[in-house]
Amino acid sequence: MEEKKVNIRIASPEDAEKLLAIYAPYVEHTAITFEYEVPSLLEFRERICHVLEKYPYLAAEVDGQITGYAYVGVFHDREAYDWCVETSIYVDQSCRKMGIGGKLHHALEEVLKLQGILNLNACIAYPEEEDEYLTKNSVEFHRHLGYDMVGEFHNCGYKFDRWYHMVWMEKMIGEHRSGQDFPKNFPQIREEAESILSKL
C-alpha cells in the first residue's frame, strides 16, 4: 500500500472543532489524559489561542483531513524555566500506526529550535499494569524519539476507579551555555516556521 503524505501546518482557532473531535475520545475512554470532562468547543478554542501567543500549535493532515495535532505549554511559570516546555501529541485513533505522531513531533522540535527552546519535557500517564484504558506505548514512543526517563510519581492520577502513575521524560534539543539568549515567542518566528513546515 502506498504511504500517504502527511502535511504539517500551523493550527488555528478555526480548527478547534476537528481537533476537539480527536481529543474527546482520549478523555472519555482512556487514561492517557487525566482530564475527566471533554472541554467545550469555546474552551478548546481558547486553549489554542493561548498556546499560539507563545508556542507552536501544529496540525497534521492526510488527504486534507486533520489526523492529529501537537503543541507545547509552559513547563513552569518562573522565568528560569523559560527554555523548557511540556509537549503534547494526540493522533486520531483511527489513524494510528501511520507515523503521524513521529512526524508531528519532528516538526514541533524544528520549530522549537527556532524559538531557542532547549528542553522538551513529556508528562505521561503510566500504568502499573496495562489495562483497557492505558498502555505503556507512550513511554516507548517517546524513547524512540530520544527521550529519557527522569522521574516517576506513584498513584497520583485517579480515573475510571483506578490509580495510575505519572512519569516525566525529557529530551535536550539545544546547547546549554552561559550568556544564554531568552527564547523568542512563536509569533516572532512564525513566518520562518511556516517555511520550514512547508519543506517537511
Question: What are the functions of these language-model segments?
Answer:
Residues 7-19:
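A short beta-loop-alpha structural element at the N-terminal edge
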Residues 88-96, 124-129:
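A short, internal acetyl-CoA/4′-phosphopantetheine-binding micro-motif in the GNAT/acyltransferase core
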Residues 20, 24-47:
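Conserved GNAT-fold acetyl-CoA-binding loop/helix
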